[in-house]
Amino acid sequence: MTTKRKPYVRPMTSTWWKKLPFYRFYMLREGTAVPAVWFSIELIFGLFALKNGPEAWAGFVDFLQNPVIVIINLITLAAALLHTKTWFELAPKAANIIVKDEKMGPEPIIKSLWAVTVVATIVILFVALYW
């Protein structure tokens, strides 16, 4: 059976997501993928420069010292930290941990994830700088 009645389609502008802070923050969080792509491409170019010898590596290091690239990399770091923060806040919602017949709150899980991140960062920096 078919009908000739047209369903009502509510008009929606292309900027509908700008009206609510939740959606604006959601778009910002999802936008952190763009700086991640930048960093991935930069890392791949660094690996190729490392493979191609000292001259190529020196050129890559000069590229990284450009003030514009430093600013872009700082923006990338901020985006990565924002993404990490929101991801760590979502993790406790996926884990249902029960201790003594009570559901564990999100704070210990979030703090544990940040502690692991800090320890891993310190270990990686130590290995990179002193090994």
From Swiss-Prot:
GO terms for biological process: anaerobic electron transport chain; anaerobic respiration; bacterial-type flagellum assembly; fermentation. It comes from Escherichia coli (strain K12). It is found in: Cell inner membrane. Signal peptide: none annotated. SUPFAM superfamilies: Fumarate reductase respiratory complex transmembrane subunits (SSF81343). Two distinct, membrane-bound, FAD-containing enzymes are responsible for the catalysis of fumarate and succinate interconversion; fumarate reductase is used in anaerobic growth, and succinate dehydrogenase is used in aerobic growth. Anchors the catalytic components of the fumarate reductase complex to the cell inner membrane, binds quinones. The QFR enzyme complex binds 2 quinones in or near the membrane; 1 near the [3Fe-4S] cluster (QP is proximal to the [3Fe-4S] cluster, on the cytoplasmic side of the membrane) while QD (the distal cluster) is on the other side of the membrane. GO terms for molecular function: succinate dehydrogenase activity. Coiled coil: none annotated. It comes from the Bacteria. The chain crosses the membrane at residues 22-49, 66-90, 105-128. It is a multi-pass membrane protein. The lineage of its organism: Bacteria, Pseudomonadati, Pseudomonadota, Gammaproteobacteria, Enterobacterales. Residues 1-21, 91-104 are cytoplasmic. Part of an enzyme complex containing four subunits: a flavoprotein (FrdA), an iron-sulfur protein (FrdB), and two hydrophobic anchor proteins (FrdC and FrdD). Keywords: Cell inner membrane, Cell membrane, Membrane, Transmembrane, Transmembrane helix. A menaquinone binds at residues 29-30, 87. This is Fumarate reductase subunit C. The keyword Ion transport does not apply. GO terms for cellular component: fumarate reductase complex; membrane; plasma membrane. Residues 50-65, 129-131 are periplasmic.
